Amino acid sequence: MKELSSWKIQNLQPYILLVPAVSILTIFLLVPLIWNIYLSLHDVSFTNILKDWNYVGIKNFSEILSDPNFHTSLKVTLLFVSGSIALQFFVGMVLAVLLSQHVRGTNTLRAIFIIPWIVSAVITGFSFKFIFNEDFGVLNYGLEQMGLSPVSWLSDPETVVWTIVIANMWHGTPFTMLFLTAGLFSINPIVYEAATIDGATKIRSFFHITLPLLKPFILINLILITMWSVNFFDLILVMTNGGPLFSSTTASLYMYREAFEFGLLSKGSVIGIFLLAINMILAYSYIKLFKRRENVIESR
């Protein structure tokens, strides 16, 4: 009996150790998700929050799907997310490669470059709102000193999204740089030495050694920055509040305004569910894409 009891304890120990983590995830992730789904199926707003909530089924979902403002917010989200991912990944990769070199001063530069990521997105938003201000902004002042006309960075629907993308790039790129730098340091230098002996150039080594070995880091980084960009709204709220004319209102900002500014909690919950679905689809797509490319390379 003692041996059987000892065997049970030994086999149950890993599951017992998981209980605290699973409990926290359940409380902070699963319970809010279930509650969000419950809200989306009822008519809930600030005006009737203390009264009985009427069950409306999928009525809220059909209203959101036919809402032209929601369609516009999805288009803005697509532009914002694609621009943010492209710039953050490209600039982050360049900085990671440059600052992973064993040169004096790179540690100090890495510490300096990580500051924008540590700074609150709200502070970043206020800073870039001042920089891009049409009347007294630093950027337009510089353009005027060079004899150029000032640009309506934040009040022109054609430029506002890309202006916010630049601000988000400044805020988020340090994470990509740090993450990919960790990946670069995990690659054994002997691999590069062998490639150099075989006559491989720096560029060939980067595309045929560095990038393939960085795939796990690149995949995780892309998933994270995509999800963060889809859910990002505080910097946009500070810089433009979704304007002008709804041209910088992303789906996450639209959800926030509908739920907390206009008090339409059910509508906000539905948009939140759609955002969760978008995040899951994008994450799954990234994983499938990387696996497919891996299988193609292995088949060669």
Features from the language model and the residues they span:
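A structural signal for multi-pass alpha-helical bundles of membrane permease subunits
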Residues: S6-R300
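N-terminal hydrophobic targeting signals that begin at the initiator methionine
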Residues: M1-L4
